[in-house]
């Protein structure tokens, strides 16, 4: 006989996930959220918690936090039928900006309660979901560098800087919706206009049914690293990062040599890579 699998006798139809680490989460804001969503099961964000065991299969999930928390929830529930409401409390709020969600808490709460449900576009690279972008090569290393700079994690910053310095130009070949080849320091496939510390990568939005391939979102190590660190430390979102872009639904990338692949700011392996735009099963709660 196998071991029994325990689940709560009842699951909630509404769940509020709070991130206490979000920059905009104050005691006053938390109290306002708890009052407004008193009819929800309220939990603190814990990436190791089995949230699926707490919520009914089509129950509404409202997440209040920064990009890391919000996008964790979106990736986790990408293939489910849950409606997801977002209350942005981070510094950059890349996904919320891309979806046209308000930054004001009162407006965001109204939409999270009674917004229009709509599927959005999510990216997948070798089966791994990404919300903002897939980056191959130096740009991916730089995203991680920018995150460490943003958080002032100087120990990690040194290690990430070493990865950036070690990055080299590679040969690439594209097939599928885009046919082409060449040499590059990095390739970027975006779903939002910015990533990480509001580092600009194009004009994409998850409201469109496609992703964008940036041909030269930073052509040299100095260009890419300079923009990443400047954006992270000064909280600036300049418009000089986007070069020529191509729209696509699916493509394959081969490189020589094999190069690291990042989904958002997470290392997910090395090339070759298959990258695709897919409509989410989950529905985001958006302005009507």
Where are the predicted features?
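ATP/NTP phosphate-donor binding region
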Residues: 1-64, 71-79, 106-110, 284
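ATP/nucleoside-binding phosphotransfer catalytic cores, i.e., glycine-rich phosphate-binding loops
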Residues: 2, 178-181, 215-288
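Short glycine-/acidic-enriched loop or helix-start segments at secondary-structure transitions
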Residues: 26-27, 72-75, 95-97, 198-199, ...
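Short, well-ordered alpha-helical microsegments
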Residues: 51, 70-71, 196, 270
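Hydrophobic alpha-helical segments that either span membranes
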Residues: 64, 69-79, 83-95, 102
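Short, glycine-/small-residue-rich phosphate/pyrophosphate-handling segment
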Residues: 91-132
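A short, compositionally biased
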Residues: 114-121, 163-171, 246-248, 253-257, ...
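ATP/pyrophosphate-binding catalytic subdomain of soluble kinases
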Residues: 126-215, 219
């Amino acid at each position: 006989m196998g071991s029994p699998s325990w689940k709560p006798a009842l699951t909630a139809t509404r769940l509020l996930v709070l991130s206490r680490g979000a920059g905009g989460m104050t005691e006053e804001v938390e109290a306002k959220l708890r009052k407004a969503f008193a009819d929800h099961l309220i939990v603190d964000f814990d990436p190791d918690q089995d949230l699926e065991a707490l919520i009914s299969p089509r129950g509404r999930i409202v997440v209040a936090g920064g990009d890391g928390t919000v996008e964790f929830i979106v990736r986790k529930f990408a293939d489910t039928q849950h409606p997801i409401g977002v209350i942005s409390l981070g510094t950059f709020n890349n996904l919320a900006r891309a979806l046209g969600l308000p930054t004001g808490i009162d407006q965001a709460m109204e939409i999270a309660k009674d917004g229009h449900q709509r599927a959005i576009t999510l990216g997948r690279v070798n089966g791994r979901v990404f919300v903002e972008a897939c980056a191959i090569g130096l740009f991916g290393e730089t995203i991680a560098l920018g995150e460490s700079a943003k958080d002032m994690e100087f120990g990690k910053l040194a290690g990430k800087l070493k990865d950036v310095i070690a990055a080299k130009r590679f040969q690439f070949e594209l097939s599928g919706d885009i046919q082409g080849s060449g040499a590059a320091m990095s390739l970027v496939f975006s779903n939002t206009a910015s990533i990480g510390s509001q580092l600009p990568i194009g004009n994409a939005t998850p409201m469109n049914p496609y992703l964008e391939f940036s041909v030269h979102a930073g052509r040299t190590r100095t260009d890419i690293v300079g923009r990443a660190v400047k954006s992270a430390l000064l909280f600036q979102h300049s418009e000089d990062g986007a070069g020529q872009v191509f729209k696509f639904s699916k493509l394959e990338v081969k490189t020589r040599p094999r190069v690291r692949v990042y989904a958002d700011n997470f290392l997910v392996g090395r090339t070759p890579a298959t990258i695709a735009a897919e409509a989410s099963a989950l529905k985001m709660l958006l302005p009507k």
